[in-house]
């Protein structure tokens, strides 16, 4: 039986400040580091060992992975960092306080931007320092690959091809794979793995620092799914 473990990064600085983060690269808070450490210890208690790991190119996910692998004494395993596993891009909302945004645009409109499957927030202006075109980590990408905003549907459009082209072959070759990523990139994977419809996936909440374990057969069909903390 193969295992795929999905781990949402620990609390970030902008999570703590209640700001829309998206592709902006903020680090973990002390609480976030403790959540990552606890996740690693939890995986260790349950005897999980990994052959390969994936993460995004954002430090809150990368550091969560590092801390988790350190607890497992597995920092030596191969790791691929991929922009396709980044958080959903929140467009012009990036950096804004969520409560203040609701006051400005109305709570209902902000709820639609946050929780509808296919309605993205207003796009980020290319002159904004938050636009990925100014970030050297995306220098090799074509302009049309760089989002100025995303819905969950658009996030899925970049996550799913990466899943099929890179992660699936790794799972066929390896027994256990760990993905440390973000709430919405993980939500995109869950939608695919669980076969959820557009409405159902928007109700799924992803806990920070709690490993979600999928047990897969050799055809990569889901046999079992559980949060590790439920079995602790």
Swiss-Prot record:
Keyword Isomerase found: yes
Catalytic activity: (2R)-2-phosphoglycerate = (2R)-3-phosphoglycerate
Enzyme class: isomerase
Sites annotated Transition state stabilizer: 182
Keyword field contains Isomerase: yes
Active-site residues, as the UniProt record annotates them: 9 (tele-phosphohistidine intermediate), 87 (proton donor/acceptor)
Enzyme Commission number: 5.4.2.11
InterPro entries: His_Pase_superF_clade-1, His_PPase_superfam, PG/BPGM_mutase_AS, Phosphogly_mut1
Metabolic or biological pathway: Carbohydrate degradation; glycolysis; pyruvate from D-glyceraldehyde 3-phosphate: step 3/5
Pfam families in the cross-refs: His_Phos_1
Residues given in the record as substrate binding sites: 8-15, 21-22, 60, 87-90, 98, 114-115, 183-184
Keyword list, A-Z: Gluconeogenesis, Glycolysis, Isomerase
GO BP: any one term: gluconeogenesis
Region (Disordered) residue spans: 116-137
GO function terms (MF aspect): phosphoglycerate mutase activity
Family under the similarity heading: Belongs to the phosphoglycerate mutase family. BPG-dependent PGAM subfamily.
Subunit structure of this chain's protein: Homodimer.
Annotated function: Catalyzes the interconversion of 2-phosphoglycerate and 3-phosphoglycerate.
UniProt cross-references to NCBIfam families, sorted A to Z: pgm_1 (TIGR01258), PRK14115.1 (NF010713)
Protein name: 2,3-bisphosphoglycerate-dependent phosphoglycerate mutase
Organism of origin: Alkalilimnicola ehrlichii (strain ATCC BAA-1101 / DSM 17681 / MLHE-1)
């Amino acid at each position: 039986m193969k295992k795929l473990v999905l781990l949402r990064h620990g609390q970030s600085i902008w999570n703590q400040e209640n700001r829309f983060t998206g592709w902006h690269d903020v680090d973990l808070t002390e609480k976030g580091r403790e959540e990552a450490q606890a996740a690693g210890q939890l995986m260790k208690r349950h005897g999980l060992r990994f052959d390969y790991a994936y993460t995004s190119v954002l430090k809150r996910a990368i550091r969560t992975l590092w801390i988790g692998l350190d607890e497992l004494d597995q920092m030596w395993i191969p790791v691929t960092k991929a922009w396709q596993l980044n958080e959903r891009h929140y467009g012009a909302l990036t950096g804004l306080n969520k409560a203040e945004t609701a006051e400005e645009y109305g709570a209902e409109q902000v709820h639609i931007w946050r929780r509808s499957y296919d309605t993205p927030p207003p796009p980020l202006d290319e002159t904004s320092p938050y636009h990925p075109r100014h970030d050297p980590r995306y220098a090799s990408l074509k302009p049309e690959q760089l989002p100025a905003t995303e819905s969950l549907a658009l996030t899925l459009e970049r996550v799913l091809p990466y899943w099929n082209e890179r992660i699936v072959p790794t799972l066929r070759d390896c027994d256990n794979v760990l993905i440390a990523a973000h709430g919405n990139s993980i939500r995109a994977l869950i939608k695919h793995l669980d076969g959820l419809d557009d409405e159902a996936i928007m109700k799924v909440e992803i806990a920070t620092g709690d490993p979600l374990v999928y047990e897969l057969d050799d055809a990569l069909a889901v046999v079992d799914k559980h949060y590790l903390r439920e079995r602790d």
